[in-house]
Amino acid sequence: MEKVITILSEQFQNDNPGVTVTYNPTGSSSGITAASEGSADLGLASRDLKDDDPEGLTATTIAIDGIAIIVNPENDLSDISLDDIAKVYTDQINNWSDLGGTDGDIVCIGREAGSGTRDGFESITDTKDSCVLDQELTSTGDVIQTVANNPNAIGYASMADLNDTVKTLTVDGVAPSEETVLDGTYKIQRNFNVITNDSKTLSPAAQAFFDYITSADAADLISQAGAVPVATSEQ
């Protein structure tokens, strides 16, 4: 979500001189807590609200993001099934040869507890509380860098943050893209949400920013950031 909110913040500040948007990328759970406690005007979360989140909050979806399955460019695998992803991350499959690749122990890279990316990944792969990770990292950038540096690694990362240092696998023959995320054929996806506190009135500047990022005016920038804008898709 960092790439999306950064590009939107920069444009909003350019259009509104004197207004500063501060973003702290500390994870979805922290964003939800900040909105609940009032330490932030808006919380940002790359997951939906859960029953055990604080009450009195509203999540407004601004974009949909595909969670890509990534490997090192040297890996000769090109496709993996959703079922096999779950087996890899629960240590039922632990060698690349079991997937048709070159012999070698699979190194599973994932995000920390509280990460919206991890929550979305585990929810869709049905691996919540059962993942066996070799490394648990605190940012998508760290996941990408680690996979890029380890020929036997596999990881998951926001489609919006992908770069050419890693190789993206198709999942059941479908590549993550704006089209496949929007039509639902790419299954590993989650919402980018803005969290507001129902008991608090936003400042004029915060309200203006909220109105902007939830409008169709932000759609092109959201697409440029690699996510799928909801305002456009629902028109």
Regions found by a protein language model. Give the residues of each.
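Exported/periplasmic ABC-transporter solute-binding proteins
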Residues: M1-A40, A45-Q235
